[in-house]
Amino acid sequence: MQANFLKEMLANIRGINSLTILNQKQFLSSVEHTLAKLVETNKVIYISMTKSAEDVFAMTDQKNNLFVIDVFSRETTFTNGVKPNTIYISNPANLTSIQIAIDKAIKKFPDAIILFDSLGVLSVYSDEKLFQKFIYLFSNKMNLLGGSILFFATKGSMNDEILSTVKQFCDKTYDFSELYIASVELAH
């Protein structure tokens, strides 16, 4: 699928916290396209709620530019037991563990772009107020550090109040969820 609609978001990612809202049909290919483009020239810390670390690493040839925090599989999925630039989180509801893992990854990749692949999935595991506080504190911390965060959310995957709160903490929101995607429509 062509992801031309992501060009603006990719061009303006440095130094800001941004939220990209997609529809379900766009989600997978858009996240994969974004990761592939970002790791070409940037270090990326990828917080995965939807894929194993092994699957995330398989999406790119630029493995040295990628650090994965795997909240999806909760334990190693690498067949050879090697865990390159990977931290596993055993409980997705433990937002403190996720923050500690991000802090460790930032020590290794200080100027990395941080990519959350699915805020909707993360919000399911957490109390609403704790989730909002986590996003607020994390966004503020990254602003102070001059960091870059890209949150992905699927339209309808989280309640409107939480989504509205996340939007408030982001410098830029891209809502591509209503776009007509010709290649997807033709495939059906």
Identify the function of each model-found stretch.
Residues 131-157:
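Substrate-engagement module of ASCE P-loop NTPases
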Residues 25-28, 52-53, 75, 120-128, ...:
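Short acidic, S/G/P-rich loop/turn micro-motifs used as interaction or catalytic elements
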Residues 1-59, 188:
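Glycine-rich P-loop/Walker A and Walker A-like loops and their local beta1-loop-alpha1 context
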Residues 42-97:
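Domain-start "cap" segments at the beginnings of catalytic or binding domains
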Residues 19, 113-116, 150:
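Structural motif
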Residues 147, 154-188:
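Phosphate-binding/switch region of NTP-binding enzymes
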Residues 77-137:
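Phosphate-binding/switch loop-helix module in NTP-utilizing enzymes
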Residues 32, 107, 131, 161-162:
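Glycan-processing catalytic domains of CAZymes
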